[in-house]
A protein has these predicted regions:
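Acidic-basic catalytic patches of nuclease active cores, encompassing PD-(D/E)XK
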Residues: 1-26, 40
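Conserved catalytic cores of phosphodiester-cleaving nucleases, focusing on short active-site segments
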Residues: 35-37, 42-53
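Long, intrinsically disordered low-complexity tandem-repeat segments
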Residues: 98-115
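Beta-rich catalytic cores
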Residues: 31
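Structural signal for conserved beta-strand scaffold positions within catalytic alpha/beta enzyme cores
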Residues: 23, 48, 75-77
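Nucleic-acid nuclease catalytic cores
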Residues: 68-94
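Short, charged, amphipathic alpha-helix that recurs within catalytic cores of restriction-modification
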Residues: 52-78
Length: 120
């Protein structure tokens, strides 16, 4: 995890106390998302963290993971614009690669993203 993504992880952990997070540091299974989350409804989900100014960069392995695991997988992007955070469902990974941050997100801002993940 890069330094900006590490800082992003700390921010997310601090501001989502109702989600139990496990940071995944896996070098053997390429493309595995950064985080495993668990909410009060006993639902597991994965989150790939990205910090992006314009284009979001994904490895082929990351794309493959979300294509193979489209349910309860998410990409959370920290952006420099006013909303700050954008949450995308993993099943839209190909659209996200093609359209970048112009793609409509399923959550905009910390509160909307947090509520989406807490209510799965």
């Amino acid at each position: 995890m890069s330094r900006p993504e590490s800082n992003f992880w700390q921010y997310l952990k601090k501001n989502t106390p109702n989600i139990s997070w496990t940071r995944i540091e896996n070098t053997s299974a390429l493309g595995t998302p950064d985080l495993l989350g668990y909410n009060k409804y006993k639902v597991f989900f994965t989150v790939e963290l990205k910090v992006a100014k314009r284009n979001i960069k994904f490895s082929p392995h990351q794309i493959s993971f979300h294509v193979k695991h489209p349910v309860n997988s998410f990409i959370l992007v920290k952006t420099p614009d006013a909303c700050g955070l954008k949450l995308y469902e993993g099943l839209r990974i190909r659209e996200l690669v093609a359209c970048g941050l112009e793609l409509d997100a399923c959550g905009l801002g910390l509160d909307a993203c947090r509520l989406k993940l807490e209510s799965l």
